[in-house]
Amino acid sequence: MRPPEFWNKPPSHFDLRACLLSPLGALYAKGTATRLRKGAPTRAPVPVICVGNLNAGGTGKTPTVIWLMEQLGAAGHEVHVVSRGYGGRLEGPVQVDPRRHSAADVGDEPLLMAAFGEVWVARDRGAGVTEAAAAGASVIVMDDGFQNPSVAKDFSIIVVDAKRGFGNGRCLPAGPLREPVATGLSRADLVLSLGDARAQETFQSIWGAEIPVPHLTGHVEPLPTGMPWQGTKVLAFAGIGHPEKFFATLRGLGAELCRAEALEDHQTLAPALLTRLEQEARLLGAQLVTTEKDAVRLPLSFRPKVITLPVRLRVAQGDTLLARLKDIAPPPD
């Protein structure tokens, strides 16, 4: 289900629906605060870096986790990721093995991240962190879980889509937030806003004064694959948080977007859907294209029919973040 448009209006914009839902938003915020106060968090014997957000839905956490896996791995770390495994049936803790696990088992994001290193799926994040440390992790990256109190975090990065920012600044269901901005950022160590220069300027003008921690910027860009996108007719489909960003990327590469099929985030790619997409692409004379996250949900027999467009995070002040990471998780001897 797509979020209502009034969620992403700036806080200065009056909307009656948001106002009427605000009491429920206050209850949601209270519930989050109560949950965060409960229980004793598991303290891992190695540093834990949390990649989270304040918004419900996609903000760019997965590319950020992959970036951290690559950078920490290059520094000599044995990096393990712990994820809840949204959309998967296994409760865990279980180490993701792409050779025997499917997206239906562990979720699409953990399966994608497992191509870059060691990934654990665990509904009980504390148990997942314990297993990862026992398996030899020298640093653990927690995928999401900023509002989960079961694991002590050494460094928390809040990822935010610069174009949408923190929306109207209200909590669910009056707005997109899991908790109030001030409350969430008081526990954060860094904010990473993702988007182009124009989006970053807008984000800074609306939210810059509200950010009490270091604020870095970045953007996600397509990897060069040798594919001649210019003028190529494509039928694109995407089941991610904001599929329109994927479609815009294809247009920016010069592809002729004959059809754009926006699916629900993590949507099951049923045989009937894939058959329809294949038939439409054939009628249009177009190539099927999808995201990396959607590709791992495709049946193996269908994957040769689809081109995947990989993207990677670029952090504008990457050296600043790398220096901070070195302090938190010194490279192994």
Curated annotation (Swiss-Prot):
Q: Which residues make up the binding site for ATP? A: N55, A56, G57, G58, T59, G60, K61, T62
Q: Which domain of life is it from?
A: Bacteria
Task: Give the matching InterPro entries.
Answer: LpxK (IPR003758), P-loop_NTPase (IPR027417)
Q: Give the top-level enzyme category.
A: transferase
Q: Pull one GO CC term from this UniProt entry.
A: plasma membrane
Q: Which NCBIfam families match?
A: lpxK
Q: What is this protein called?
A: Tetraacyldisaccharide 4'-kinase
